[in-house]
């Protein structure tokens, strides 16, 4: 049987990444071990924006090696699982022209529209995660994908 296409369409990907709240970001320690942390994020212009504490393990790892992988998923039962795996580089977003939009969307998503407590955030840094490769899956599509594969096989006589 041919491989089933369970990937998210571009519209589904945009919707999924806009709705999800947490990315699990994996960076590499100096010895090469994975360091995985959950972070809140916003998806703006095909880029993941998040913030973290300056000088923590995550930001130190990224200063040494900006390569990272992020996992965003949803669902509990196997047939409900869906998600996105992003591979790319993470960098500080200090001069990014989209930062005001990012802050506004972040505030709406996580603070109910209130501005973040910047007076307590003096040691926070905004990060930009630029995807190099995105993989997605939606196991809710399995029944239809199997039915399509069967129809295709029947049509080709395979």
What name fits each language-model region?
Residues 1-8, 78-158:
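Charged, gly/pro-rich active-site loop segments
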Residues 44-45, 57-60, 79, 145-146:
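A short local loop/turn or secondary-structure capping micro-motif enriched for an aromatic residue
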Residues 2-24:
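Short, basic/aromatic recognition patches
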Residues 14-15, 40, 60, 76, ...:
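Short secondary-structure boundary/capping segments
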Residues 20-54, 62, 70-73:
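Short beta-strand segments
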Residues 13, 58, 64, 98-102, ...:
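Amphipathic alpha-helical interface surfaces
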């Amino acid at each position: 049987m041919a491989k089933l296409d369970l990937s998210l369409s571009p519209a589904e990907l945009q919707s999924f990444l806009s709705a999800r709240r947490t990315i699990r970001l994996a960076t590499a320690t100096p010895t090469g071990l994975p360091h995985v942390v959950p972070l809140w994020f916003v998806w703006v212009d095909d880029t993941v924006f998040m913030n973290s504490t300056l000088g923590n393990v995550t930001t130190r790892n990224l200063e040494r090696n900006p390569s990272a992988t992020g996992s965003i998923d949803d669902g509990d039962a196997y047939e409900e699982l869906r998600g996105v795996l992003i591979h790319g580089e993470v960098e500080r977003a200090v001069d990014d022209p989209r930062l005001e939009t990012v802050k506004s969307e972040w505030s709406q998503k996580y603070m109910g529209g209130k501005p973040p407590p910047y007076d307590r955030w003096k040691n926070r840094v905004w990060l930009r995660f630029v995807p190099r490769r995105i993989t997605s899956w939606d196991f809710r599509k399995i029944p239809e994908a199997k039915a399509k594969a069967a129809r295709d096989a029947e049509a080709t006589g395979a």
